[in-house]
């Protein structure tokens, strides 16, 4: 059961990678890849919300009136894990492995929960392509940075709504 949960997650990652590849290939085909800012990030580290044994239906973990999933339910629906019939989540042991070398995971303000990847590709401004950086970044810095790169002022109004001041730089 545990392996099937990770197999489903790995399938999701593989599918996501293929779709990102399709976008990159298309941008290359139309000769716009080097004129495009590509930003890829995660909102948090791996999640332990699957608990000790994983969940076939993660929504049930929020339902205090129904019994939680157990291994028997997951085993009974083994072939459905990863399909449109499940809203599954892998066990927390996989979350630990997903965050290596960082301890803990999403929900905790500890390395495994808050140190997540950010990849930005824009050859016009990033000269040392492929460099791995260790300094912290915060999502509030992305929009101001992109506006600066594109030499665009932050609009004061959007569709008649006054925009708040940006806190990033």
Regions found by a protein language model. Give the residues of each.
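Metal-dependent active-site segment of extracytoplasmic phospho-/sulfohydrolases and closely related
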Residues: 15-53, 77-80, 96-99
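Beta-rich accessory regions
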Residues: 27, 31, 56-60, 153
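An alpha-helix initiation/capping motif
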Residues: 14, 35, 39-42, 140, ...
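Short secondary-structure boundary/capping segments
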Residues: 46, 51-65, 161
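The substrate-binding groove and active-site-proximal loops of carbohydrate-active enzymes
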Residues: 3-15
């Amino acid at each position: 059961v545990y392996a099937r949960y990770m197999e489903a997650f790995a399938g999701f990652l593989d599918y996501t990678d293929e779709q990102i590849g399709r976008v990159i290939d298309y941008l290359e085909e139309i000769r716009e890849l080097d004129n495009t800012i590509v930003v890829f990030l995660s909102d948090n580290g791996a999640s332990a919300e699957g608990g000790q044994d994983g969940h076939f239906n993660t929504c049930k973990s929020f339902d205090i009136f129904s019994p939680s999933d157990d291994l028997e339910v997951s085993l009974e629906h083994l072939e459905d894990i990863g399909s449109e019939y499940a809203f599954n989540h892998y066990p927390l042991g996989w979350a630990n492995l997903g965050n290596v070398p960082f301890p803990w995971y999403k929900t905790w303000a500890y390395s495994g929960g808050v140190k997540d990847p950010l990849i930005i590709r824009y050859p016009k401004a990033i000269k040392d392509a492929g460099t791995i950086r260790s300094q912290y970044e915060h999502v509030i810095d992305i929009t101001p940075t992109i506006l600066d790169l594109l030499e665009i002022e932050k609009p004061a109004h959007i569709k008649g709504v006054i925009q708040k001041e940006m806190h990033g730089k």
